[in-house]
Curated annotation (Swiss-Prot):
Belongs to the iron/ascorbate-dependent oxidoreductase family. Pfam families: 2OG-FeII_Oxy, DIOX_N. InterPro entries: DIOX_N (IPR026992), IPNS-like_FE2OG_OXY (IPR044861), IPNS-like_sf (IPR027443), Oxoglu/Fe-dep_dioxygenase_dom (IPR005123). This is 1-aminocyclopropane-1-carboxylate oxidase homolog 12. One of its GO terms (biological process) is biosynthetic process. Residues 215-314 form the Fe2OG dioxygenase domain. Its EC number is 1.14.-.-. 2-oxoglutarate binds at R305. It comes from Arabidopsis thaliana (Mouse-ear cress). The lineage of its organism: Eukaryota, Viridiplantae, Streptophyta, Embryophyta, Tracheophyta.
Length: 366
């Protein structure tokens, strides 16, 4: 039987009304709401398994110390083996002693917070859903109008840093210097990571870089306001990344979980560490040797939670480069598991479906 509430609830109309405020989730919190609006409600079967099961509650993703990566050949090879184990079995690992200065990490987190807590009228000047033509875009839920069943409890801004960096005036003053400085270090560290990943595949160090895996850097900076009813919603629903590789800087609030052996495992924050995870395109070109693992972020009464995700994603701009399983990694015994596809085509699938809780790789699996 249709109830009065179910008749009155129109998800599209409510999403549009929320979007037109241009104030995001923070605007709701600033209005001192005590109940989470219906568009943010997730299905109960998704929300009932938030805590890791007893069998995995003591598990943690691999933590790899990079202090000796440049010391000598033996030290580098030992780190490559640890990276190989992590990306083949977990798809995630945390890096300590990665050489990015702590003050640079703290300043980018502070810059992200400053922007999101800026005067609403200033933020509105950067609000857009035209990510294709603007270097810097602020909004809430990039997939708000996709087929995703629920809206997530977060606001974000995104910025394409490479290969064509934005002009300084395109970046808000509150986070401008921090973004340029942090991204400079991320690009350098990303280059090292792709060298180690190439070596973990038994290939030459520059193999992945030669495939343009390091060419494009997209930064997405999330702000998760405190939630009055965290048991009804999620910060980000289950998904995998449509990138080659993602570097994540998170604050001390926590909430990130990865799906490991059909159970959710907490990724506990480590001060000064970076979280690294394999994206869909690296799983594709390695023919499932490296795994792109689904993950999510819980909503929390504490907050705001700040995170900075840096995606090495080739170019989402129109280009003709085709990606498929690498010839060096396929054989009669291990045939290609995916069809060839362009970044543009895969991104179209990703943005049309949004974060709907299913793997986008399934659309191109042979």
């Amino acid at each position: 039987m249709m109830t009065k509430n179910s008749i009155e609830f129109d998800p599209y109309i409510e999403r549009k009304a929320f979007d037109e405020t241009k104030q995001g989730v923070k605007g709701l919190v600033d209005a001192k709401i005590t109940e989470v609006p219906r568009i943010f409600h997730h299905r109960q079967d998704i929300l009932t398994n938030k805590k890791p099961s007893a069998s995995v509650s003591d598990l943690e993703i691999p933590i790899i110390d990079f202090a000796s990566v440049h010391a000598d050949t033996a030290s580098r090879e030992a780190i490559v083996e640890k990276v190989k184990y992590a990306v083949e079995n977990w798809g995630f690992f945390q890096v300590i002693n990665h050489s990015i200065p702590l003050n640079v990490l703290e300043e980018i987190k502070d810059g992200v917070r400053r922007f999101h807590e800026e005067d609403p009228e200033v933020k509105k000047s950067f609000f857009s859903r035209d990510a294709g033509n603007k270097k810097f875009v602020y909004n809430s839920n990039f997939d708000l109008y996709s087929s995703s069943p629920s809206v997530n409890w977060r606001d974000s801004f995104s910025c394409y840093i490479a290969p064509d960096p934005p002009a300084p005036e395109e970046i808000p003053e509150t986070c401008r210097d921090a973004m340029f400085e942090y991204s400079k270090h991320v690009l350098s560290f990303g280059g090292l990571l792709f060298e180690l990943l190439s070596e973990a595949l038994g290939l030459k160090s520059q193999t992945l870089e030669s495939m343009d895996c390091v060419k494009t850097l997209l930064m997405i900076c999330h702000y998760y306001p405190p939630c009055p009813q965290p048991d009804l919603t999620l910060g980000i629903t289950k998904h995998s990344d449509n990138s080659f590789l993602t570097l994540l800087l998170q604050d001390n609030i926590g909430g990130l979980q990865i799906l490991h052996q059909d159970s959710w495992v907490d990724v506990s924050p480590i001060h000064g560490a970076l979280v690294v995870n394999i994206g869909d395109f690296l799983q594709l070109i390695t023919n499932d040797k490296f795994v792109s693992v689904e993950h999510r972020v819980l909503a929390n009464r504490q907050g705001p939670r700040i995170s900075v995700a840096s995606f090495f994603s080739s170019s989402m701009r129109p280009n003709s480069r085709v990606y498929g399983p690498m010839k060096e990694l396929v054989s009669e015994e291990n045939p290609p598991k995916y069809r060839d596809i362009t970044i543009k085509e895969y991104s179209k699938i990703f943005f049309e479906k949004g974060l709907d809780g299913t793997s986008h790789l399934s659309n191109i699996r042979i």
